[in-house]
């Protein structure tokens, strides 16, 4: 395993203030938040969410930032309306049984295949936070991955085999937290070794003073978290800007 299974920290977070500018549509059978005016035949970013799903305000604000940078952005509901909420009790084991990797992979694969078939974008970037990172990695695989580049933050559930399967021509940006038992130092180092061995194009950034989840739902009233969260988004935009033009 390149990152451990999701844990309690994956179900904790802070909601950020702001008014989303995008719109909700049914796209390829999934409730989807769409942002941007760029043609979907040009540059597209698909955001694969954590367990908070595609109605959580934070991810919508993030999508708007990507849209402002010139991308058509889609945030599909890969949880089929079963996102968790901080103010409601949750049986984590039961939730993960409903949203196993096998179940979620079919949902993500279906959306990506139809996106490619319908629009055939010139560039597809895929972003994955925590739970969603596994499926982002799968879509830069040399075995059927449909994205051109990926950016993931504090990943969970990613296997070493999925890291090894990454197409060396498809770049991956990994943003990691210093305090993270889901993606701890030993698994970070193992991930680096595999990427290096496979001659992958990669960048791995480690942020001090932050914990798992910081890029998606961190408490931005804390200066270190605010800096790291904002820096990750800037890095992701720069990453996709660069690799969509090479």
Swiss-Prot record:
GO terms for molecular function: hydrolase activity. GO terms for cellular component: cytoplasm. It is found in: Cytoplasm. Keywords: Cytoplasm. Its main location: cytoplasm. Transmembrane segments: none annotated. InterPro entries: AB_hydrolase_fold, Dienelactn_hydro. Present with 1800 molecules/cell in log phase SD medium. Belongs to the AIM2 family. This is Protein AIM2. It comes from Saccharomyces cerevisiae (strain ATCC 204508 / S288c). The lineage of its organism: Eukaryota, Fungi, Dikarya, Ascomycota, Saccharomycotina. The gene is AIM2.
